[in-house]
């Protein structure tokens, strides 16, 4: 039985000043306004033995909001919900850390108390290359978070001078470029800092052990998942002491902090496990396990992942490989995607206009839909300009052109991966919000020339819950 509840949360008091521990050092206090959050959550009921089973919590912190999914050992969903990031923070990078923390606490509060009491393991994902620099003693965030798509061209020449040609870090948006850019500002006591990714930082809030990451998030700072170590060319740099320790995704870090077990009613022996990136979590959710299987995540951005027997890395095209057990998850992420659709259309318009599109007929419109200049994949060009002209009088034709153009970008991505030596894509599963648009799936199937299906599970938070399950099994020796 499925019970859907929608309710309004009472006013949530946000953090009063960025000067608090764990936030930004600032010369002035900036009071943050009160706001209201809305949350959806679903609770699955009607299962025997619920009072005795162990459950596993995964959370996803994407580009626009957070989600949670709670599963049992068989992978059946027991509860799920979502939160948007505080709206007044969306255009203010100084507010991102407090926004993420507020959303984390809200998601935990939204999980039904009876479900929380059964959660034995927690993991979560964050956006790739979203980077924070912290004081290694206090955990205070020392500067604005560097967001996933933020480029640091000032650091690129230095990074290219030390890294192998066409390495993953040789991109202005890489975590390493962000670290070098910050290091070169020569802030006081920089040697006592530590680098964390978004997922690492949120997990640290839960377990309290500063300086732990996973090899998916650490890829873009230069970590080599094949040798399971940082390369010598990186360890020889003065800022290498800021690099976090790296473990496999889904590895137990330690118990949930006592403050969380008391406040939210989680079990005392609940563990916290290393996480992953949002696109990897979406791939895990789809449960694509054979080489040639691919997952396109259609969220605010477009991310493609292809399971390959061969590792492919080429920063010229924004292509990189993540380790997935004994195989490689090859892909990249484009700045096109759902964000530009939301900028141009309301949800109601998208649903209504999509119904009028004939997906079997190609659109003659040739767009490159971006919110602003700059692209990562399949073209790594920080100056690539958006192209949304000419605009036809018909909104249906306009939307058709955008959806088809995004599909063409997706197709160019898979073609590029094949040319670079990855296993050829045979089937594409779809995750993210775009998976709900049946017309778009049919357009993509025609453009790609491949079977395109919805993944059974489309939320990255489900993939994160599978990591929590993995960590719990490893921790118990199963």
Curated annotation (Swiss-Prot):
EC category name: transferase
Reactions it catalyzes: D-ribulose + ATP = D-ribulose 5-phosphate + ADP + H(+)
Gene for this chain: XK1
Cofactor(s) the record lists: a divalent metal cation
InterPro entries: ATPase_NBD, FGGY_C, FGGY_N
Enzyme Commission number: 2.7.1.47
Protein name: D-ribulose kinase
UniProt-listed Pfam families: FGGY_C, FGGY_N
Subcellular location: Plastid, Chloroplast
Purpose: Exhibits ATP hydrolysis without substrate. Can phosphorylate D-ribulose with low efficiency.
Gene3D superfamilies noted in UniProt: 3.30.420.40
Ligand binding (ATP): 300, 338, 433-437
Species this protein is from: Arabidopsis thaliana
The entry's keywords: ATP-binding, Chloroplast, Kinase, Nucleotide-binding, Plastid, Transferase, Transit peptide
Gene Ontology cellular component terms for the protein in this record: chloroplast; cytoplasm; cytosol; plastid
Gene Ontology MF: a single term: ATP binding
Family to which this protein belongs: Belongs to the FGGY kinase family.
Transit peptide: 1-38
Residues binding substrate, per UniProt: 60, 64-67, 278
